[in-house]
Amino acid sequence: MKNTIKYFGVLALSLGLLGSCETVDFGNENLNPNQPSKASTAALLTSALRSLPSHVSEVNGNMWVQYISQVTYTEESRYSTTQWSYDGWYSGGLKDLQEIIDLNTLDAVAYSGGGTSANQIAVAKILKAYYFQFMTDTWGMVPFNEALLGVDNITPAFDTQEAIYTAGFSLLDEALSSMNNSGTLNGDILFNGDMSKWAKFANTLKLTMAMRIADANESLAKTKYTEAITGAIGSVSENIEYPYLSEDTNDNPWQDRFETREDYALSDIRSNRMDIFLFSQCRFFIGVSSGP
C-alpha cells in the first residue's frame, strides 16, 4: 500500500513538473544540415546528367547480343536480370528530371537557384525525350504516360513505341519554343548553361528520331526532319561529348571494366567471325593513303 502511494505521488509530481514547463524554441538545433528539406534543382540536373552516360553505355546489350560474355559474374550473360534492366532509369535520372519539371511548374520562384525556370524545364524535357527514345528503342513498349508518379501509381501501363515517339517530339517542340537563350541554367555539366547548345541537342535528337520512324510513319518523319535539320549539329566540332573526369568516381565506366578488371571476354560467336568483321571491307582501302 505504501509503495502504491509513493508511486502515485511521484507520478503526480512528474505531471506537475511537465505541466509547468514552457515550450522551448531550439531554432535550427534539431535540423540535419546534411538532409535538405527541399531538393536543389541544380543538383537534380547534375544527377540526371551524371547517370545518363552510364545508362546509354551499359554493357548488358553487348552481352545479350553476344558480342562479349561475362567471366566472373554471369547473371547478365544468362539473361537473369532482364526483368529489372530499366528500373534504374526510372528511379534515377528520369525521376530527377520529372522533379525539376514539377518543382519549377508548381513553385518557380522558390527554385530559381537552378537558373531560369523556363530553361530548367526545357532542358529536363529534352533529356526526358532522350531517355525515353533510347529506352523504347532498346525495350520496345515501356511505361511513359503513367510513369514517374511514385506511390500514386505503382503499376503504370505500358505505352507503344508510336505513342512514346509522338510524346517525345512534343517534349522537344515544347522545349525549343520555351527556352530563354539569355537566361541561366545551373548544374549543367554538359554544356555549362549554354542554351544554344541545348537547342542543337534538341534538334539533333529530333532529327535522329525522325530518321528512326521513316519506315513506320514517313509523313511525320519528313515533317520533323524538315523542322530540325537547320538547327541540328552540322559539323564534327559540334559533337556532343560527355565530360568524363580523371577520378575513379567520374571516369569512363568502360575504362574501369577493362583497365584493371577481367569481368568480360570476347564471346566465341564474335571471335569465330572476327575475320569477317575485320577484313571484309579491307579491299576498299588497299593502296589508299590514310592521310595525315
Question: What are the roles of these predicted feature ranges?
Answer:
Residues 1-9:
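Bacterial N-terminal signal peptides that target proteins for export
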Residues 227-292:
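Extended ligand-binding clefts on enzyme/binding-domain cores
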Residues 17-18:
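Bacterial Sec-type N-terminal signal peptides, specifically the leucine/valine-rich hydrophobic h-region
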